[in-house]
């Protein structure tokens, strides 16, 4: 009996008697479609992932970003739950001590090759943008944007020098994060770049040669994923990214922490309670804080 079933299975495979299985498999996939005119040169560089996410991502206001500048990174870290892993360390800051806060304008670069270069030229011509994506940002960045560039990390390549940075700065961008390098370090440390920090992995005199292949699409910075429109908070230690839908939660949490810590400092100055009862607050002191609010 087993031999007969085995022979039938072989016969079915040879004759296509199991065609229904192939039909079922094919039905899993949606039919592909031709891209409409202008699709490849959409100004926001179409990303299927972002097409799913964007409807739920709120607009971020300049006032919210201004509020966020005063929130310590540790407080943000405590408020974002599962997004705590989105911190990338190991960056140098061209403006030591200056904080970087804004919305991510992402771009991804790859080492050059002739066919990739031809494709980049075609898209740049059709879309009427500069194929050098840092130059494109110098024409398209909006106030409050942070250019976030994936450029191969410590083994990668340079994004720009002081002229490219000046163009981006003049658009009102808040700064730049480069998972890679830059040139003109001395120039970028000049006073004219006060308020425009560039977080980077290294600097050397090479000019830019890598090709921009993604603009306003998901990128990898260090070991974390960054999406266009993410909130960027950077300092001398590193840079943190989180989705804009969490921004209001972060600001509300920060206000709560500020009130609690002011209360704790007052208790410490009064010297009426033990430190262990103040930090963290004992239940009775938590109730007192609640009554004061």
Predicted region positions:
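Sec-dependent signal peptide recognition
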Residues: 2-10
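Boundary at the C-terminal end of the N-terminal hydrophobic targeting segment
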Residues: 19-23
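N-terminal low-complexity or amphipathic/hydrophobic leaders
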Residues: 52-127
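General beta-strand structural signal in soluble alpha/beta enzymes
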Residues: 89-91, 148-150, 176-180, 198-200, ...
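Extracellular/luminal Protease-associated
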Residues: 135-180
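Ligand/cofactor pocket segment of small-molecule handling proteins
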Residues: 167-206
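Acidic, glycine-rich flexible loop/linker segments
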Residues: 201-279
């Amino acid at each position: 009996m087993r031999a007969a079933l085995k022979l039938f299975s072989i016969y079915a495979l040879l004759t296509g008697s199991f065609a229904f299985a192939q039909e079922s498999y094919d039905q899993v996939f949606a039919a592909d479609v031709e891209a409409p005119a202008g699709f490849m040169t959409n100004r926001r560089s179409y990303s299927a992932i972002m097409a799913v996410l964007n409807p739920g991502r709120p607009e971020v206001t300049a006032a919210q970003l201004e509020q966020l500048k005063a929130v310590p990174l540790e407080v943000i870290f405590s408020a974002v739950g599962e997004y705590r892993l989105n911190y990338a360390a190991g960056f140098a800051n061209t403006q030591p001590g200056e904080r970087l806060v804004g919305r991510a304008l992402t771009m991804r670069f790859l080492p050059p090759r002739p066919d990739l270069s031809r494709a980049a030229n075609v898209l740049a011509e059709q879309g009427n943008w500069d194929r050098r994506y840092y130059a494109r940002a110098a024409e398209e960045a909006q106030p409050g944007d942070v250019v976030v560039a994936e450029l191969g990390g410590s083994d990668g390549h340079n994004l720009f020098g002081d002229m490219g940075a000046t163009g981006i700065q003049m658009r009102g961008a808040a700064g730049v994060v480069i998972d890679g390098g830059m040139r003109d370090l001395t120039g970028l440390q000049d006073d004219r770049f006060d308020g425009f920090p560039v977080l980077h992995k290294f600097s050397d005199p090479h000019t830019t040669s890598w090709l921009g292949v993604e603009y306003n699409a998901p990128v990898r910075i260090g070991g974390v994923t960054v999406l266009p429109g993410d909130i960027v908070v950077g300092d001398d230690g590193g840079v943190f990214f989180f989705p804009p839908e969490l921004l209001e939660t972060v600001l509300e949490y920060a206000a709560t922490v500020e009130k609690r810590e002011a209360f704790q400092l007052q208790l410490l100055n009064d010297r009426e309670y033990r430190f262990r009862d103040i930090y963290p607050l004992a239940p009775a002191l938590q109730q007192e804080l609640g009554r004061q609010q």
